[in-house]
Regions:
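A short local loop/turn or secondary-structure capping micro-motif enriched for an aromatic residue
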Residues: 58-62, 121-124
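Vicinal oxygen chelate
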Residues: 1-2, 5-14, 41-44, 60-135
């Protein structure tokens, strides 16, 4: 077997109508397809497809994602301010890890999402990112 990538991730919803509006209008993601008449559709992020699925329509118990899906943006602060202007709440301040900026928030069903921007090369330590030892 040779797995060559991830085709899509599923995000469970309780209210597909509300969620599709959030992902499409609030986040500005392109809706690429609807799954027939099922309460499910796909949104494109540029590198990964997010499939929103109303859990009960597929016989699945609804449980929101407890770990965030990291959505890449060029400027976390600017993206955060844009979303705050649309009513999105952020439970914490923006985090600077030493290699990236992150801002956590939730979709209408409580799934965790994150705005993310890496400013250091992958694999760099915080010291290397800051120009310290080993840089």
């Amino acid at each position: 077997m040779n797995i060559t990538g991830v085709d899509f991730i599923c995000v469970p919803t309780r209210d597909w109508e509300k969620s599709k509006d959030f992902y499409g209008e609030t986040l500005g993601l392109e809706r690429s397809k609807r799954w027939g008449q099922m309460p499910a559709s796909e949104f494109e992020t540029g590198s990964l497809t997010i499939a929103l699925m109303q859990a009960d329509a597929f016989g699945i118990e609804f449980r929101p994602h407890s770990l965030p899906i990291a959505l890449h943006v060029d400027d976390v602060q600017a993206a955060r301010e844009e979303l705050e202007g649309k009513g999105v709440k952020f439970p914490t301040d923006t985090i600077d890890s030493g290699v990236c900026h992150m801002a956590h928030f939730h979709d209408p069903d409580g799934n965790q999402l994150m705005l993310h921007s890496r400013y250091a090369p992958p694999g760099a330590t915080p010291a290397e990112a800051a120009g310290g030892a080993g840089a």
